[in-house]
Amino acid sequence: MNYTQTLEFLFSSLPVFEAKGATAYKPGLERITAFCRHIGNPQRNFFTIHVAGTNGKGSVSHIIASVLQQAGYRTGLFTSPHLQDFRERIRVDGEMIPKQKVVNFVDKHHGKMVELELSFFEMTAALAFDYFAQSDVEVAVIETGLGGRLDATNIIVPLVSVIT
């Protein structure tokens, strides 16, 4: 698959909340937990700051990531939704995930994604965790999706939680 084909798979084969609304949301942490176990639990390889709340999550997440980066930490940032480019969601030290990393991850794991019926958000979170671990991130700032106790990002064990 190339990058365009990969995005077509992601947006057409996995339930996307922005396109399908509540029908894309499947409560529970079982799928993301099983998938992250399948890929080696990468979310355990770095410290996390978990950002939740009604408004301002993205702005606060970007500010925290910028401060950490300026302080010399190798920093991951996971936010949603993206505005123009899917890769905006996943950054290391301010740089978007390379297209080829997205393609390689989906090529390698798409069978398991389909088998577990991962949502688009669950897959995106797992991709971020995997990329952060591969990139030797020291601290990752993780923005919740829909929030609540069953949000896919709740498989992390945060060093700090922030509510906006």
Question: Which residue ranges define each predicted feature?
Answer:
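Catalytic cores of secreted/periplasmic lytic hydrolases that degrade extracellular macromolecules
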Residues: K57
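ATP-dependent carboxylate-amine ligase catalytic core
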Residues: A22-L29, A34-R44, Q70-I156
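Short functional linear segments
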Residues: M1-A52, V60-H62, S66-A71
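Conserved beta-strand/loop subsegment of P-loop NTPase cores
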Residues: V160-T164
